[in-house]
């Protein structure tokens, strides 16, 4: 029997010398409820397939702030109590680090309760309010100028309603399901290389284009050749 979240596929490509990518997983002990750890493993494998040596580290409550920016940061979904603990810890200094890292071009992927915690701490322009929404399968189209984008798919487990300071910062528009709040048709948030979604699944398993985009953004930040500007 496979271990949880074991990857099934071809062997990764050999890593190019000096081509190391550093990934920081935020509060993994508090965000393990919905299988979002799979996003970490999928991104790691995608980067390895592109010839990268991937170093994955973890940051928990009370840990020392990183001395330098990572190439990517990931945070999964969290229950309300864990979300509060995370938000309080973020306010102690990690929120400022993340905001500066994103401004410097680092990639961030936040899911559901982790996204809400980042909003609570002021890292991303999103707020979560109490709600009564039910679990649902969801589909959304990526927002792109002048046309329809790729399909974003997953399932939603949040009762809260998520609101963006500016709906134009949504990652996608809903095709089915309720997205951020069931009212304005938005799903997730995107600010530069920071992506947030309410979808589990894990999201990167069901939406390969998003997995590839994150990897592209990471390599573009590092100045690697062979990545077209989007």
Identify the meaning behind each predicted range.
Residues 27-29, 159-161, 201-203:
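Glycine-rich beta-alpha junction loops
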Residues 18-21, 146-152, 190-195:
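Beta-strand-turn-beta hairpins that frame and shape the catalytic cleft
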Residues 79-146:
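Cysteine-nucleophile active-site neighborhood
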């Amino acid at each position: 029997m496979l271990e949880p979240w074991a990857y099934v596929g071809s062997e990764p490509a050999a890593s190019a010398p000096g081509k190391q990518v550093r990934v920081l997983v935020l509060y993994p002990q508090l965000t393990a409820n919905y299988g979002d750890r799979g996003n970490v493993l999928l991104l790691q494998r995608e980067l390895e397939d592109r010839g990268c040596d991937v170093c994955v580290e973890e940051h928990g409550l009370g840990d020392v702030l990183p001395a330098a920016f990572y190439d990517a940061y990931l945070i999964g979904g969290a229950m309300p109590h864990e979300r509060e603990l995370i938000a309080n810890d973020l306010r102690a200094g990690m929120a400022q680090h993340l905001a500066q890292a994103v401004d410097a071009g680092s990639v961030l992927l936040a899911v559901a309760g982790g996204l809400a915690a980042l909003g609570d701490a002021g890292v991303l322009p999103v707020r979560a309010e109490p709600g009564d929404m039910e679990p649902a399968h969801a589909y959304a189209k990526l927002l792109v100028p002048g046309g329809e984008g790729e399909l974003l798919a997953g399932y939603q487990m949040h009762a809260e309603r998520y609101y963006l300071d500016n709906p134009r910062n949504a990652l996608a528009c809903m095709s089915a399901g309720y997205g951020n709040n069931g009212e304005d048709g938005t799903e997730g948030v995107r600010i530069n290389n920071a992506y947030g979604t309410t979808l589990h699944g894990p999201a990167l398993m069901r939406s390969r284009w998003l997995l590839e985009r994150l990897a592209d953004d990471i390599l573009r930040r590092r100045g690697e050749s062979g990545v077209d500007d989007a």
